[in-house]
């Protein structure tokens, strides 16, 4: 039983990644559910504080579809997700971690995982922005600790070398997986790897066959992704 949230940074620098998923989403989503009927998927598409309409209205800054097995809802939500601006270099990842942990309708007894598709770093404690947020006291490490206690794993993709250490620390703190990855066109394949690795015995054979296929093709990047996720596979 897998509850998986896919969280997209929708700011400008990440547009190629979410667009790649939009390109393949009609094939990807049915494939994920056909391999694992006990799967539930949630989607979060987010920007930063500067994308909020007001301090009380997230607007397009935080777009969310809670966990569901409705394939059409997932496909439509991803295709309609709005781009955001992002403003400064850091994004409100600290808030994303907090909201996903606290607000997702996680099923009791499920494997709980979040794939964070992002390329920046979280804001530091004390961050302020133009009346939207003032001296924010959200500490991403404390939020990661809360997630870890609830058994929620945060996976990360080391897209930008400047922030590799924070990606790895977040995943390590939550017992998630940090994968070396940059090729936006293969984003949907990383999502598939994450889902297959945690599908239990029913997806183990497909996971291994897919990993072997990438190795045979000489696809080094995807082979590294599958190697990283191998620790999640149930044998």
Sequence positions of predicted segments:
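Divalent cation-coordinating acidic motifs and surrounding scaffolds
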Residues: 1-235
């Amino acid at each position: 039983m897998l509850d998986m949230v896919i969280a997209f940074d929708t700011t400008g620098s990440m547009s190629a990644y979410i667009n790649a998923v939009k390109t393949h989403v009609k094939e990807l989503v049915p494939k994920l559910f056909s391999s694992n009927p006990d799967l539930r998927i949630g989607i979060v598409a987010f920007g930063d504080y500067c994308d909020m309409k007001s301090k009380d209205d997230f607007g397009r800054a935080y777009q969310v579809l809670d966990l569901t097995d409705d394939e059409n809802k997932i496909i439509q939500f991803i295709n309609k997700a709005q781009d955001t601006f992002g403003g400064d270099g850091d994004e409100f990842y600290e808030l994303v971690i907090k909201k996903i942990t606290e607000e997702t309708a996680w099923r009791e007894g499920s494997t709980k995982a979040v794939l964070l598709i992002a390329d920046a770093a979280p804001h530091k404690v004390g961050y302020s922005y133009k009346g939207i947020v003032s001296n924010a006291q959200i500490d991403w490490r404390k939020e990661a600790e809360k997630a870890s206690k609830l058994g929620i794993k945060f996976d990360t993709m080391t897209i930008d070398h400047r922030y590799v250490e924070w990606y790895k620390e977040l995943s390590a703190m939550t017992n998630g997986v940090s994968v070396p990855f940059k090729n936006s066109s293969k984003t949907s394949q990383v999502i598939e790897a994450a889902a297959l690795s945690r599908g239990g015995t029913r997806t183990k054979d497909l996971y291994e066959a897919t990993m072997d296929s990438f190795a045979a093709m000489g696809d080094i990047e995807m082979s590294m992704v599958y190697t990283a996720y191998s620790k999640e596979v149930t044998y």
